[in-house]
C-alpha cells in the first residue's frame, strides 16, 4: 500500500476516538444499583476506556488527548455525564448505538479508532452496566475539549458508512457474560472488551482487520504489535497460561518480555486490574488461537542471546564537552545503557532493569520496538510497582541521541544480545521518531 494512501486511511481511522456530546432530552434513571455500577466500572476498565479519553494531567474521561496524524490533530472528547460538555444527555439507546454501532446520536458516524467494531460483540447486559456506570459512577467534568478538525478527505464522516459495510464487526454475544465458561469468557474478553485484534491483527487496504490473520501481528504508530498466536516460532506458543497471566497482570516476565508503549498502557490501565479468573480465561483463549507464521521470525523471540563478556571500551581519555562527534553503538551502549542493563546485558539482579538476552524485544525479527523503547523509554505502573526507563529522544532529560546514534546502538544491542543485525538506519529512526507524537 502506498504510504500516502495508508496515512490518509489511518487519519480517517484515528479521527473518532469518542462519543459526541449533542443536545437531547435526558432519559437515564437518577440512580442505579450498586452491583450494576460495580460491574460497569469493571467492564470500563477491561475496555480501557480511560486511555484515549483522558489527556495527560487531565481529569478521567474528560477528553482532550491529542493524537497527531498527517491530516491534523485528533482530539478525544468528553465522555463524562456532564449534560452540556459530555454525554449526560445520551439515552441508553444512544449510548448503545455509539458503543456497538459507531453511530452518534445525531446519526453521523464515528471513526473506528473508537473500537465499536469490537464493542459490537458486547452483551445487552454489559452495555446496560456500562451505561449505568458512565452516567452515575463517573464524575461530570464541565470541559469541552478542542474540536477535531482534519483535512479532506479524513473530515468526511459519511465515508464511514461504506467502511462499516466492509468491516468485520464482532457478532453480539447473548446471555450473561459473567456465567460464560472459561474459553467463551476468554474469547469475549479478547474479541470485545479488550479488543486485542485492534492492535495485533494486520489490516487490509481498507484498514479492516484481516480475520484470516487474527492476532498475527501488525504495525501500530511506530510500534509493532507482535504475533500472539499459538505459533511456537513466530508467536507465543511456548508461553504457559501462568506466564501469560503474569505478563498481563504485571507487564513483566523475567527472561521473557516486558510491556512498553501501547501495551504497557493497556497493562497499567486495564489488564492489571482484571480478576485472576478473567486473566486465566483470556490467556487460555489466546494460547489456542490458530498459529500464524511470520516470514521475519523463524525462532522464538525469547530464545536469542546469552551474557556477553565484551571488552571494556573505555580508554581513560577525557571527552571534551564540545566534542560532538558521534560514537559507535558499543560506546553509546557503554555510556547510556550499561549502568542499568550491565556490560554483559544481564540487567539488574532484581530484574528491574531486564536482561537484554532472552528478551522478546531484542529477539524480534524487527527493530521497531527496540528503537521506540530507546526513543520513548518505559513508564508503567502495575501490580503496585512503577517501572521507569528514560527515553533518549530530542526531549530527553538524560541524553539526547541523534537518529544515527540510535540506529547504531539498536544494531549493536540486537546483534550482541538478540536476533542479529537488522540494519536499522537513521532514516528508519527518523520515521519512527515522528510517530512518537501519535502514540496516546
Predicted regions and their residues:
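Bacterial N-terminal signal peptides that target proteins for export
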Residues: 2-12
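C-terminal segment of classical bacterial N-terminal signal peptides
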Residues: 17-26
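Boundary of Sec targeting at the N-terminus
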Residues: 27-31, 41
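Flexible coil segments in periplasmic/lumen-exposed cytochrome c-class electron-transfer proteins
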Residues: 32-35, 54-73, 105-187, 191-192, ...
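C-type cytochrome heme c attachment motif
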Residues: 42-54, 77-78, 94-101, 112, ...
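The feature marks the first
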Residues: 48-51, 68-121, 125, 222-226, ...
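Short, contiguous acidic/charged loop-to-helix segments that flank catalytic cores in large enzymes
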Residues: 235, 347, 356-365, 380, ...
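Conserved helix-loop functional segments at active or binding sites
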Residues: 250, 254, 288, 292, ...
